[in-house]
Amino acid sequence: MSATGIIIGEDGRSRCHWHANLPDYLRYHDEEWGRPVTDDIRLFEKICLEGFQSGLSWLTILRKRENFRAAFSGFDFEKVALFGEGDVARCLADAGIIRHRGKIVSTINNAKRAIELKDEFGSLAHYFWRYEPGHNERPAVVDREHIIANPATPTSVVISKDLKKRGWTFVGPTTVYAFMQAMGLVNDHLEGCFCRPEVEAMRTALVRP
């Protein structure tokens, strides 16, 4: 790996270092991470899974993602909001997910809060994309040093505070920034990564919600 954080894959392509040449992580890096998302279900899924990741690695969550989807009705927040204590018990007994009561209860709570956000803003996408940082808030160069030095940003702090004020849980500034990176509100593919210009083109073409 170079000092910039770029590694060359077996296919000769330059990529961000963090995929570590693990096949499932590499697919996630190449096909999902950073590509702009405006679908409410995917946005809700991601912010919930980032909450489950707290204290763990994203790879652990990624490898259990289909199990999470099965346990939480595909992260349809209208359905998850109706979960009761029986559903909590079912999830706690599900070895395919992270069996953390606080995070399970948080997901149900956040589903109810997501409905409130949708009622107020028309969609989760409209709420979150309002916070897309302007060019003047972004670094001139996105390299490994920048990523390490900025696990959270002023924008993610603002979003975190607003969500918490609205009753959301497990949405700290670092969790929120990881969500922003993954959902394409920022392009944090490193300079030199083959995905960076692809993501930038998608962001340019995107019709903001």
Where are the regions a protein language model picked out?
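HhH-family (HhH-GPD) DNA N-glycosylase catalytic core used in base-excision repair
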Residues: M1-P209
